[in-house]
């Protein structure tokens, strides 16, 4: 029985309207010869169009021009067609990339074509008395019907005949992505999660060196004689490092099996030994990574032999290895950290000529990249990466893991071994002893007499007691001498062994640094998990070199979590100014105040008030957010701003109708009787940053500054400028970051957790600095590490080599010097106190004593002849390269945030000025009482009258009376607090200095601090930047001022201190790369001479104004008179 089949479904009828094909096409483009927009209307059917135009002119096409031939005609056959038709003029419009067209002519009669556009010449009588125009699109040829000019919208770029619709979205897109002039002004900020890979294997090599002074050809050079290192981290990597140390015969410190040392006075010997160890260690780790890669890809042997005739895959290059198919295996990530305290500015430079080696014998398939960046005399980066392909790498589609701050295998293009140098001082900003206390680490009592050690290595002896213990002159003070003597006597040793004692103290410092490394790792990871709220993050504080870079990474992670942009950047809300806009935004970043308004001795009460966490409070205020407006919307916003500024009424900082932006402005001050000693703005027009009451011309300022100037009575005019930037909205972008740190600090205070308090305070203060980071187009590279793009840039002239330096190396000639035959003058041998506890270089010179021969009680030591190696090698060359284009490419820092942070701080100080000086406005400046005598960026020194005004008018801003430190968007208001810094150490009440002396900016002294409540007196305050502060006192500064006023010889008032001159890469002939030399800095002590204020009388200074103009300002400014 057959089954019934289902009938087929009914055939669907197509519905629609049949239309005839279009006969014409339209093309709008820019004519490159006139730079004007044109519209080209052309025929879509070339055979039909040519036939019709011939018929209109009562002509026929040649018989050989068949429709088939014309239909298949391309650009290569166009010339033959024109010569066959011979029109009186033949134009060829060729389509170019990016919406451009060019017009050329094919001449068929001599003298009838444009001489500038002739591409062919053929002298023959025309057969057509009308012109022909052809359009070439790719290889296709069409006949043009007509070409006529059209209009172009300057805001959206659309071409039109009469009118068009210009949408806001199109205007934004055209301004930021199409317009060649402005499309690179703002760049998206790249983002990668803050955490590191969870399977990262780490090895830490913590070290410290001790040096002595050697008189060389480049001055008093510091030479290492001792190096102690400790190994820690993943046990398997520690075992590898341990075996290499034993193989190279490093001495083990008896108190810790993982600590090794090397002692030798030979110049460069310590560096060579350390370099050899570091080279072999990184080679061993690289081989370990390569072995695991080989094991996971056994087919590589056969593939290398088949494609490159290599029996050993180790001979492959990285470019060849990238072509390996079907790469397998789990990627590995190894990190080797070379860590020390305050090594970037000293130890790494001293050792760098020996330890920097670009020829370590790592397997050839690795891609080797180096990130080397010296900055301000320190090695900020010195990282080397050995990379292999990562088989798991792919483009990320889901970004939820990134929002949690974590990453996995697919996010890394390469598996790698990274060798990085890290300085714990850059992460703590304090001495090792202070850092140990801040992070609750045990610290051994006592210290080492480094002055005696230095003298011992220089001369072979030092002054000592009978048992060899250094005399009191080598110690800081009598108490230190007694303490260390007592500690040594407890060891019950017959004689004091200065080398052994130095080794023990150096090793203990290394152990403390190693404990600090572990504590920093653990504490910061805990902070990120608990305080920041990222429990899945494997955070490693040493992944980034400084506290500033870590704070910026935390900030970016918080923004990414909040905004969820689902991309590899922070999205359009927070952009980085670049190229022309970078320089424009940098022009709006103005530093803080620091100058006295009183020179001389002030004999009246003086209180010091300081803003609490000024930058942190400013960061919580609204900042610009979003993609900057296009010129059309920008013009409307500027008009709104100017109308508001023309109204004399007070403007609110938080008016929602006024958008944030950065403008070029002119501003005129009010009448001089209405001016204040604290101007609302500053200018660099005279070459020096001056806080001035003069008219401002062509200054770049934020909208916050416009409000501050307006509310202080200034008349502000916005100057038209194409670089003017206005943002679509305000947003408290950094408020969450600051709140997290403040909450963590308060919680740490309650729990008495000094470690977490230190972390929160450091991170809170570091963020502003990262926004203000200044970039340039310079970089320093090793000659054999120049990549292909850099070499091409140098060849093309887009990159210049500014200077080249060669490193001192160790493998050619040698000079043998018998033991201490050279004679030294005492002044040549001012010794350096190389105490590793001290992170500053402002140390007094040590006393020097030359012992007579055979003096009893001295420790004498005779060295064998010392070998000094001092040569150059051509390939150890550093190049400083710089782009020819001065414009900076920035995709990292939203610099405009720094500009607004500083603008908010100026708003704080402007309100502060209102408390103090509002009652004086209308009175001539010379008749006003003194209310403040010194101003710093975040502090004011006020008199008794100023103190009374702060307790009345400014009461809401004094911290002890309550108040907020974090801006509240629901109740917008300026949010800042101050506290009196001069407080009684006994009862805590506000105290004052009854007498003070002011000589210059950052050069002043308060005689003492007197408490009117309990009538107790405590130590005063002295500030002397650039001087050896321990050599100064209040009486000396008073004598200096009085001598200057009386015309006495002031040269006798000076201070001297020992300083370290660090040279990394320099074009100076007298400075050798990678050396640290010791110099003596002598500074004259005198009152301020090159003042940036005008003198009102013998003591009082006031800002420049119309009646007292800045004599440095010679800039000519055009002003149109109405």
Curated annotation (Swiss-Prot):
EC number(s)? 2.7.7.7
Name a single GO biological process: viral DNA genome replication
Catalytic activity, reaction form: DNA(n) + a 2'-deoxyribonucleoside 5'-triphosphate = DNA(n+1) + diphosphate
* GO CC annotations, alphabetized: host cell nucleus
Cellular compartments annotated: Host nucleus
Quote the InterPro entries the UniProt record gives: DNA-dir_DNA_pol_B, DNA-dir_DNA_pol_B_adenovir, DNA-dir_DNA_pol_B_CS, DNA-dir_DNA_pol_B_mt/vir, DNA/RNA_pol_sf, DNA_pol_palm_dom_sf, RNaseH-like_sf
One GO MF term, please? DNA-directed DNA polymerase activity
Domain of life of the native organism: Viruses
Where is it predominantly found? Answer: host cell
Q: What class of enzyme is it?
A: transferase
- Which Pfam families does the record match to this protein? DNA_pol_B_2 (PF03175)
Q: Any idea which UniProt keywords this protein has? A: DNA replication, DNA-binding, DNA-directed DNA polymerase, Host nucleus, Nucleotidyltransferase, Transferase, Viral DNA replication
Q: What does this protein do?
A: Eukaryotic-type DNA polymerase involved in viral genomic replication. DNA synthesis is protein primed, and acts in a strand displacement replication. Assembles in complex with viral pTP, DBP, host NFIA and host POU2F1/OCT1 on viral origin of replication. The polymerase covalently transfers dCMP onto pTP, thereby initiating complementary strand synthesis.
Tell me what else is known. Answer: This DNA polymerase requires a protein as a primer.
Subunit structure as annotated in this protein's UniProt entry? Heterodimer with the terminal protein; this heterodimer binds to bp 9 to 18 of the genome. Forms a complex with viral pTP, DBP and hosts NFIA and POU2F1/OCT1 for initiation of replication.
The UniProt similarity line reads: Belongs to the DNA polymerase type-B family.
Query: What's the protein called, per UniProt?
Result: DNA polymerase
Q: Which species does the entry assign this protein to?
A: Human adenovirus B serotype 7
Encoding gene, per UniProt annotation = POL
